[in-house]
């Protein structure tokens, strides 16, 4: 019988690793709360039409990477490959623009793409997204970029480079694509296979190529900056000015495009310069047409997404987790002691004291070893003597000091116990 294992491209996040994920989530939630962004959760699968129309039928994501299938009702379903389209669908369906035209939202969760697994890239991966819906003001673009940079700074992720570009409006891109296609057709035989396939359907996507030789051909290609309308030029200049005011350094990269068709005007990526694997941590831009394209009212928006696996790779060494310890570990021996132990366990938990009850039936020596292994601050001992006298023994694990008191007194002195636990936590390095 074949051994059952996790599917290639997926990864278990075990408890010790989950602590880092939780740390990042709490850090991000706190930062975004003070910017008045509210968390939203959308389903992990949607009608495939959402991504066909939203992301674009000529993109690699739709053509090659989506987990797409028919369910038992023969509906065309896709596991979400990114988060923005689902947020936009929720915005339209729930008429969130009626509640408040300006919606500042964020999300975090698993996404799915059929890609070659490598460091920082899995087939099930996690993204954090930030979306500012309802404003075409350049300050919204600057705010999204600044928030992303603040997240990295709060996690002590340094050596970052912000690449930014304007890809203009649809009309600007149509003029540009025609000139780009005309230029690249001269070199058709020299282009890599993917770029040859893109040349007729979506030539602007060739700018995203990783093929070194194709990149050299692109060095002398037309620049989209020469095709921007005055409105797009002004918007881009304003974004750059606001970033300067916010002390956010940036590099204008005229060949930067994003892998999703819904972007217009601002497009950006944040990269780490010392990365061993994938170096792009964050990407985003403006998507003023997407909401209308998916059936909503004309509503401008801007957002970004951060790859959490990649972020964790570069941030983990900078995260100092608090010592994970148990406030009280209860050991007991005998039927009566076990009954009292389970009652005291629930009493302490109700008092917000982190408590674990040893249910191993081992001797006291082995139970105390477990208390030590789990870094317990206090060990509560219930043995034959304690049961006969209706008392409890408290052993403070760091100092080895012991106290004995009646069970009634113990319950009445819960405030004393909590203060002493807090004091002993400062020295819990055994």
UniProtKB/Swiss-Prot annotation:
One of its GO terms (biological process) is histidyl-tRNA aminoacylation. It holds the Pfam family HGTP_anticodon. Its EC number is 6.1.1.21. Keywords: Aminoacyl-tRNA synthetase, ATP-binding, Chloroplast, Ligase, Nucleotide-binding, Plastid, Protein biosynthesis. It is an enzyme of class 6 (ligase). It catalyses: tRNA(His) + L-histidine + ATP = L-histidyl-tRNA(His) + AMP + diphosphate + H(+). Signal peptide: none annotated. PROSITE patterns: AA_TRNA_LIGASE_II. The keyword Nucleotide-binding applies. One of its GO terms (molecular function) is histidine-tRNA ligase activity. It is found in: Plastid, Chloroplast. The keyword Lyase does not apply. GO terms for cellular component: chloroplast. NCBIfam families: hisS (TIGR00442). Belongs to the class-II aminoacyl-tRNA synthetase family. HAMAP family: His_tRNA_synth (MF_00127). This is Histidine--tRNA ligase, chloroplastic. The gene is hisS.
């Amino acid at each position: 019988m074949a051994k059952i294992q996790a599917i290639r491209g997926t990864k278990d996040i075990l408890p010790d690793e989950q602590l880092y994920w939780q740390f990042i989530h709490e850090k991000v939630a706190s930062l975004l709360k003070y910017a008045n962004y509210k968390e939203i959760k959308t389903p992990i699968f949607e009608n495939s039409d959402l991504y066909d129309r939203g992301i674009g039928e000529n993109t690699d994501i739709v053509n090659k990477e989506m987990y797409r299938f028919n369910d038992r009702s023969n509906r065309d379903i896709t596991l979400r490959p990114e988060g923005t389209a689902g947020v936009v669908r929720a915005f339209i369906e729930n008429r969130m623009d009626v509640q408040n035209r300006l919606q500042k939202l964020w999300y975090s969760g698993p996404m799915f793409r059929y890609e070659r697994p490598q460091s920082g890239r899995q087939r099930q991966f996690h993204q954090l997204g930030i979306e500012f819906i309802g404003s075409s003001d350049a300050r919204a673009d600057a705010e999204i970029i600044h928030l992303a940079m603040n997240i990295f700074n709060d996690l002590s992720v340094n050596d970052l480079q912000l690449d930014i570009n304007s890809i203009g409006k649809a009309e600007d891109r149509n003029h540009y694509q025609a000139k780009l296609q005309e230029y690249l057709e001269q070199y058709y035989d020299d282009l890599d296979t993917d770029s040859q396939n893109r040349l007729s359907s979506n030539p602007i996507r060739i700018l995203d190529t990783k093929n070194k030789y194709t990149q050299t051909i692109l060095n002398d290609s037309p620049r989209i900056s020469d095709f921007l309308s005055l409105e797009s030029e002004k918007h881009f200049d304003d974004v750059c000015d606001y970033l300067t005011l916010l002390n956010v350094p940036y590099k204008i990269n005229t060949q930067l495009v994003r892998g999703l068709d819904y972007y217009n005007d601002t497009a950006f990526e944040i990269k780490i310069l010392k990365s061993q694997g994938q170096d792009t941590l964050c990407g985003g831009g403006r998507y003023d047409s997407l909401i209308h394209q998916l059936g909503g009212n004309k509503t401008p928006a801007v957002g970004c997404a951060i790859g959490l696996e990649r972020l964790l790779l570069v941030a983990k060494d900078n995260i100092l987790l608090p010592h994970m310890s148990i406030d009280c570990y209860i050991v007991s021996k005998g039927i009566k002691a076990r009954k009292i132990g389970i009652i005291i366990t629930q009493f302490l938990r109700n008092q917000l004291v982190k408590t674990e009850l040893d249910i191993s039936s081992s001797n006291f020596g082995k139970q105390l070893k477990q208390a030590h292994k789990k870094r317990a601050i206090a060990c509560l001992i219930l043995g034959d003597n304690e049961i006969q006298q209706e008392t409890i023994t408290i052993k403070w694990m760091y100092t080895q000091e012991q106290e004995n008191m009646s069970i009634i007194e113990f319950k009445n002195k819960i405030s004393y116990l909590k203060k002493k636990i807090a004091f002993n936590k400062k020295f819990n390095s055994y």
